[in-house]
Amino acid sequence: IMSSDWSSDVCSSDLAFSHDMPDYARLYPVPLEWSRKYAIRRYGFHGISYEYVAGETSRLVGRPLEDLKIIAAHLGNGSSITALDRGRVVDTSMGFTPLEGLMMGTRSGNFDPAVFPYIMEKTGLDVPGILNVLNTGSGLLGVSGVSRDMRDIVAEMDRGNARAKLAFDMFVHVLRKYLGAYLFTLGGADAIVFTGGIGEKAWRVRQAVFSTLEPLGLVLDPEKNQAAAGAAACISAETSSAKLLVIAADEERMIARSAYRLAAG
């Protein structure tokens, strides 16, 4: 990177958006000395995407961000979900590393660490070897045995592949668990947003997520859901208690906006 008297360098961190998450959400229930001495905490990722999505949600619903409770899910090969209250991150699924949280393309998501010594004994793998499997050979790929790509998973599921269906069902199940937890954390939501490759394009996933949530007031419009395309779309029915949105991630635009704000002073 080159600098001169007429240029400046701007660093845009993917972690910055969740920097003021409350301690009760960002810290792990381990000895507090670990957290303080070794910075063991939930850092949160996809922050640039979430900052952009939050602003677009405010614009689409016609209300200031400071007046909104938003649950946003960035679903792709790396997936996470975040709860925002008045523009502030109050909880997020990725943690100390991007391995924690939702089931992903090749990452396991949440995993009981007590399995480590058991797998080490059974397979002969060391810790780096196990972490490699959890990061690159698990998730949709590991369960389905087919692919990390949700499009391939759905196609195989429709052909009757039981492992592909299991992978799809697990992905949706974990996502729904987090969605329910964040609805309780926020005390409800004004908008639920899907972004990222799977979030934007996999209408079957969105359909499965909301398939039984009408009693909670979250009502999907099936036609809008299947037709959703472009930069942004509302896929909720008129009777839904929250706006259900699909917003295309535009992290480059968010980085450019941040750089412009800094340059403008």
Name what the model sees in each region.
Residues I1-V10, D14:
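Single conserved hydrophobic/aromatic residue that forms the stacking wall/gate
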Residues D20-K122:
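Glycine-rich phosphate-binding loop of actin/hexokinase-like ATP-binding domains
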Residues D67-A73, P128-G137, A191-V193:
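Beta-strand segments within the central parallel beta-sheet cores of soluble alpha/beta enzyme folds
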Residues L84-D85, D91-D126, N132, G196-A227, ...:
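Catalytic phosphate/nucleotide-handling subdomain of diverse soluble enzymes
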Residues K165, D169-T185, A189, G199-G265:
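Internal helix-turn-beta structural module
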